[in-house]
Amino acid sequence: GNLVTVDFVCHGVPSQKVWQSYLNYELKMKQGQTGEGEFKSFKKISFRNKTNGWKKYNIELIFSDSQRYMQYFAENPYMIGFINNLYLRPSCYHCAFRSFRSHSNFTLADFWGVENIHPEIDDDKGVSVLFVNDNNAYVEKLLNRISYKKVSFDDVVLGNRSIVSSYDCPQYRHLFFKKLSLGFDFNLSILKPNLFDRVMMKIERTFQNKC
């Protein structure tokens, strides 16, 4: 048939509630800095602005007044929580489609660590990997239209474990959502738990299920 199916490997899908909470936090910070009106929206949001390259990418926000805000991903509270798997959807911690269980013809994924294996193709803008899952006739047509290099499966998985396994649910995920529901600022909720928090977590785990 003519049907060609493609899926992609993702880190996980974050909570919509958390995303909205983060945006509200940034709008609140913006208003506090300017002392002006109430900023209600953004013109543009980029998770990975690569002006400084992939390895030093920024999260970029452009507010309704066209002012731009950029922050290094490792210092941005939202990205810190996302990278540490703090607020992925519950199903993401037990993803049923990793390890090529979707049965698609092709799978796309990030080739993290390519700079250590094939530095000659690393442009610091991001390199993708294409898995050919069957002998679909479309393969030859596709390869004639792209620049590619054959690599080993082990080399790819070494830098991107999402291809074959889900991330563990963080022990303090429940505490994070509890803080958020109590009205803590987003940046304070994202902080790792202190001693009191850890004691409370231990008590709560006795009565609650994990993700």
Predicted ranges, named:
Residues 12-22, 119:
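Short, charged, surface-exposed secondary-structure boundary motifs
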Residues 1-8:
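A short alpha->loop->secondary-structure connector
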Residues 10, 20-21, 92-95:
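Functionally engaged cysteine thiol sites
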Residues 5, 15-19, 88-91:
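Internal, well-ordered alpha-helical segments in soluble enzyme and binding-protein domains
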Residues 27-211:
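Long, compositionally biased charged/polar accessory segments in the mid-to-C-terminal portions
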Residues 1, 17-20, 57-60:
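Short acidic, glycine/serine/threonine-rich loops at helix termini
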Residues 8-9, 114:
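Active-site adenylate/phosphate-handling loop in enzymes that bind or generate adenylated species
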